Regions:
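Active-site phosphate-binding strand-loop segment of PLP-dependent enzymes
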Residues: 1-32
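Catalytic P-loop NTPase motifs of RecA-like helicase/translocase cores
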Residues: 10, 37-39
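Active-site PLP attachment segment
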Residues: 52-85, 99
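Structural motif of enzymes handling amino- and sulfur-group chemistry
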Residues: 82, 97-116, 120, 124, ...
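Conserved PLP-binding catalytic core of the aspartate aminotransferase-like
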Residues: 120-162, 179, 185
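PLP-dependent enzyme catalytic core of the Aspartate aminotransferase-like
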Residues: 172-205
Length: 205
């Protein structure tokens, strides 16, 4: 049995999963957390399930939060029919709280909106990448909106200019600083250009 995060922010897994493909997957139950992929990557935001299924593991289970890509307070589990039926019979499943009906109703009725937002997100990611003078300072994955880096001076500069990013020490206060820029569909063209301009200014210094 192998457990993994589909999006590990280092590029080791998604999109090609090179290391995973070296394993004897026909003998392995593969369990993947796709919380950072569902709604963003894959055809129509379907995540990595079909990609991982194409590797033909002995069994595939994909779980995810719907809160990141879809903004729904709930979760999902995808897998082979027999496994899902088995999970449905457990006390863990029976005692779990479902997503709020209003959230699920909105989710089901919003396919067109999600599609439009993914197009905007794709364009925003391209605008960000194309505008940077030093893209190699970032660790990122194709078509994914997260860009990690290790320059504390950049984080300080952005904060001073009222640009907020993910920036904290994890998993404890003695750990290395985790800095990550997340592009979203809510960002306007001017937002991306402003961010790029500040990052490029740092590159020149």
């Amino acid at each position: 049995m192998v457990f993994l995060d589909s999006i590990d922010f280092s590029g080791m897994n998604y999109p090609n999963f090179e290391g995973l493909q070296l394993l004897p997957l026909d003998d392995i139950i593969l369990v993947a957390d796709d919380s950072h992929g569902i709604g963003i990557v894959g055809e129509n935001g379907s995540g990595v399930y079909q990609k991982l299924k194409s590797f033909k593991p002995k069994e595939l289970i994909v779980c995810c939060s719907l809160g990141k890509g879809y903004g729904v307070q709930g979760g999902a589990v995808f897998g082979f029919t027999e496994r899902i039926k088995t999970l449905q019979k457990t006390a863990f499943f029976g005692g779990a709280s479902p997503a709020a009906p209003v959230g699920l109703a909105t989710f089901l009725d919003s396919e067109e909106i999600y599609t439009q937002k993914r197009v905007i997100l794709k364009n925003n990611i391209k605008l960000f990448i194309d505008g940077l003078k030093r893209l190699n300072r970032f660790v990122y994955m194709p078509k994914h909106p997260s860009f990690s880096y290790a320059e504390e001076a950049s984080s300080n500069h952005l904060e001073k200019n009222k640009i907020l990013i993910t920036n904290f020490r994890y998993p404890n206060e003695d750990s290395d600083l985790l800095s990550r820029i997340i592009i979203s569909a809510a960002h306007k063209k001017e937002d991306i250009q402003c961010l790029v301009r500040h990052l490029n200014t740092l590159s020149e210094n």
